[in-house]
Amino acid sequence: MRDSPGSKSSSERWHDTMAVSDPTAEGKDESSAKTSGFWALTLGSVGVVFGDIGTSPLYAFREAVDHAAQEGAVTPAIVLGVLSLILWSLFIVVTAKYVLLLLRADNNGEGGTLSLMALGQRALGRRSLLLLALGVVGASMFIGDSMITPAISVLSAVEGLKLAAPRLQDYVVPLTLVILVMLFAVQSRGTARVASAFAPVMALWFLTIAVLGVLHIHEDPHVLLAVNPWYAIHFLLNHGLLGLVIMGLVFLSVTGGEALYADLGHFGRKPIQVAWFCLVLPSLLLNYFGQGALILAHPEAIENTFYRLAPAPLILPLVILATAATVIASQAVITGAYSLIRQGVQLGLLPRFEVRYTSETHAGQIYLPRVNLLLLIGVLLLVLLFRTSSGLASAYGIAVSTTMVADGIMGFVVVWKLWNWHPAAAAALVVPLVVVDMMFFSANLLKLFDGAWVPLLFGIAMVVLIWTWRRGVAILIKKTRRTEVPLLDLIQSLEKRPPHIVKGTAVFLTSDPNFVPTALLHNLKHNKVLHEHNVILTIETAQTPRVGPAERVRMENISEKFSTVSLRFGFMESPNVPKALAIARKLGWQFDIMSTSFFVSRRSLKASAQSGMPAWQDKLFIALSRSANDAIDYFQIPTGRVVEVGTQVII
């Protein structure tokens, strides 16, 4: 926890009470603390950010070369072409676009597709339907990717058993299913206890794959010629449509690149950049070059080039390490999906899903039961449907490439509008990157009927859910607005003919403070009473990840008995009404929680033929509304102080 400005840390206060310290020594201690903290973040990013892209060597190079050979001989031209494509894809897509460009496009320190969408809309100064569509599509495809990443990663690691113990070949799929079920089962307990081991394990993984690559490069040093981009260009020119197909498989080497930006808020730009340039990128390149040299020297190794890098006695330990690395990579993707869904809820794109906190000290450690169950079902179905990592490789990539295209276009808006670049300069920087993304997207479309339809289907389902929810909410607001009463009109009416006044404070939750909350109208109509203090409470979501205490609360007295309070939360925050109201007390709002009642409206929806949506969408919206988490729980309001008022609304 950071100390407030002007305050002293515990170590500084200790020194003040014991002795007068040497200023030079204090400066060195502070510098040392900053340095150690920086390297801790750098190591931490290795354990969380790079799991997906770090496990790509298990299958990416093998699949690309195998398809390029088309059951023929593996030639040096194929190996050098594929290696060059992988190397320059890592340079352009991951290094240039994400590590050097988008990591600078932070939304108050946060990254990710929805964060970039909010940043772009803020830069434009208005809500853009194009940016909203890009954000929704990009986020939805990330959810589709969240299902396929654990499946292909764990399955490709366990497949090493075929080499270590051939008799266990029939147990690869069952063992993969067991590992995945266990992974999703422990989510409800949180990962704080084991998260500290993620970074050392992944650091060991990257060092291991680097060493394995180095040990084989000497078998054919000519693979280093792949640094020349001409080999990539020559390969594409000479292979026509097949070259585009291979690009779809080469893309497997950069999947996970989008995670660098999504995890920006957890570690910061510099630690991620240092980890990438100093450890991750060199390790990946050395391993890919090692696999290339191995295939040129031993073409039969194409069966499983990654595990063939290791001496026979070390294959089983490597399988264990690879499985651990893929589980960590899967964990990072699952956590990212939770975070993305919560952001979507806060931004009004999805209904309120139940959120459980698995750590008392880290607000980001969350668990979403329904999301976890849906992800588990999707992952298990993928494993059972495709059964091999080679089969899943055909399905992998379409969702990630869609997200990357969306990120690129939104990145252009940020560079142009927020950074105030000339449109031509912004286009010169971003358009080439987007063109490369579009090439990969086109290449992955060729895999549509080979399995890419599966994650695409998951992504489209998410788009439909978001579209239905937003459309339904808009229709609901429009219909209820017809019967709502302006708040000022009611106050004037009550001043002329006051009802019976009871002691205490009533807090009415509403989405629009200009109109009378339904719960207040029902209280007056049925109970015929009015509290001596009435607060119209609205909860807003800012276009920034977090909101400082100074911007959290806005209060306004409307009359002697009525006031409005607006609470603002960032889209990365968990709304906590009692804590926010504690800030309001410091600002002068006098209230006693024990004499305060919270009035919440609960709507029961029924469809009508004139709703404006098809019947299937009406039913879907009503189902989503019923499945939404209770507002009382979501906003963490004390249940003992809540009065719920039920109303029926025909949409």
UniProtKB/Swiss-Prot annotation:
The chain crosses the membrane at residues 38-58, 74-94, 129-149, 168-188, 197-217, 232-252, 276-296, 309-329, 366-386, 396-416, 423-443, 448-468. It comes from the Bacteria. One of its GO terms (cellular component) is plasma membrane. Keywords: Cell inner membrane, Cell membrane, Ion transport, Membrane, Potassium, Potassium transport, Symport, Transmembrane, Transmembrane helix, Transport. It is a multi-pass membrane protein. Residues 1-31 are annotated as: Disordered. Disulfide bonds: none annotated. Coiled coil: none annotated. The keyword Transmembrane helix applies. Signal peptide: none annotated. Residues 1-16 have a biased composition (Basic and acidic residues). It holds the Pfam family K_trans_C. The keyword Transmembrane helix applies. GO terms for molecular function: potassium ion transmembrane transporter activity; symporter activity. It is found in: Cell inner membrane. It catalyses: K(+)(in) + H(+)(in) = K(+)(out) + H(+)(out). Its main location: membrane. Belongs to the HAK/KUP transporter (TC 2.A.72) family. Transport of potassium into the cell. Likely operates as a K(+):H(+) symporter. This is Probable potassium transport system protein Kup. It comes from Nitrobacter winogradskyi (strain ATCC 25391 / DSM 10237 / CIP 104748 / NCIMB 11846 / Nb-255).
